[in-house]
Every structure is written in structure tokens, then in C-alpha cells.
């Protein structure tokens, strides 16, 4: 798979070892203030191509990793490697590897679900959380268990859990 930096010349693509695997990370900007951009499903770090230069121009160092199993990031075999706990550990390890003094997580879709849970578990690990497209887990769970309307709307989430 081509690196984002081969397509967008203002982005650098680096390899970051975190939580025992190699992450492909698109990066732009410098400094101790990090914006960690977590993409959705079925997306890729290139999702953030328009936000990265804007944030870098504001003085942030921007990291947009391809999450575990996406792009050129390592693809561990077996569903146990994709549990929410492991994905939250990935976020913690990426933050640690960045050595940033201030961290903002910007997340969309599947990345937002991971970010919500990470922020609830480790509130002191980040300074800001920006979520696109995903409600807080508490009202979402309430809507899912209240009746069939939301469950019907989110049928595809369950569909993708089937072991083909």
C-alpha cells in the first residue's frame, strides 16, 4: 500500500513502535503540543489530509496513525488483538512515544469510539478531546438497549462482527 507521503508531499510518514507493533504514522508540524488524529472505519490516516496542515499552521505537531490492522500498520492475526482494551493501550503507547507535553485527541467514527473510552479511562492523559460523528457511550448504550430503533440503524456494526 502506498504511503500518504507519496501522495501528499507536505506530509511525512514515519514508523512508530508502540504497544509491541509498528504503526505507520502520517505527521506534519513540530513542537510539544500534539494532536493525535484517530481515523474511522473503513478509513485510513489520509482521512486527516485537510486538517493536518491547518493544525500544523496553528503550531501543533499532528500525528495521524493508521490504527492497528489498517494501512501499513502491523496486522496481528486473531480478534483478541482488536479488543477495545488493546486499542486503548495503542493510544496510550502512541502518546508516550510522541513525548508530547500537551495532547489533543481528534477522532472520527471507530477512532472516536476508542477515544471516548480512552478519555474516560485515562482523563489525565489528554488535555482535549474532539469527537466527530459518535455520541458519548452512555447515551448511545441507552439508545441501543431502549428499543429496536437504534439497533436497527446500527445493524451493520453487528454484521461486521461476524467471523467470515
Regions found by a protein language model. Give the residues of each.
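Flexible "cap/lid" subdomain of the alpha/beta-hydrolase fold that forms the substrate-access gate
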Residues: 2-12, 21-23, 63, 70-106, ...
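Conserved HGGG/HGGXW glycine-rich cap/lid loop of the alpha/beta-hydrolase fold
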Residues: 27-74
Amino acid at each position: 500500500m502506498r504511503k500518504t507521503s507519496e501522495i501528499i508531499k507536505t506530509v511525512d510518514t514515519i514508523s512508530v513502535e508502540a504497544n509491541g507493533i509498528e504503526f505507520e504514522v502520517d505527521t506534519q508540524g513540530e513542537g510539544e503540543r500534539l494532536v493525535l488524529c484517530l481515523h474511522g472505519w473503513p478509513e485510513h490516516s489520509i482521512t486527516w489530509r485537510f486538517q493536518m496542515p491547518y493544525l500544523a499552521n496553528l503550531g501543533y505537531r499532528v500525528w495521524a496513525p493508521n490504527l492497528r490492522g489498517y494501512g501499513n500498520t502491523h496486522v496481528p492475526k486473531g480478534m483478541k488483538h482488536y479488543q477495545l482494551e488493546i486499542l486503548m493501550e495503542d493510544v496510550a503507547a502512541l502518546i508516550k512515544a510522541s513525548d508530547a507535553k500537551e495532547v489533543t485527541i481528534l477522532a472520527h467514527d471507530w477512532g472516536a469510539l476508542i477515544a471516548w473510552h480512552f478519555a474516560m479511562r485515562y482523563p489525565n492523559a489528554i488535555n482535549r478531546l474532539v469527537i466527530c460523528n459518535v455520541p458519548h457511550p452512555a447515551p448511545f448504550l441507552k439508545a441501543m438497549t431502549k428499543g429496536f430503533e437504534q439497533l436497527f440503524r446500527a445493524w451493520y456494526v453487528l454484521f461486521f462482527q461476524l467471523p467470515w
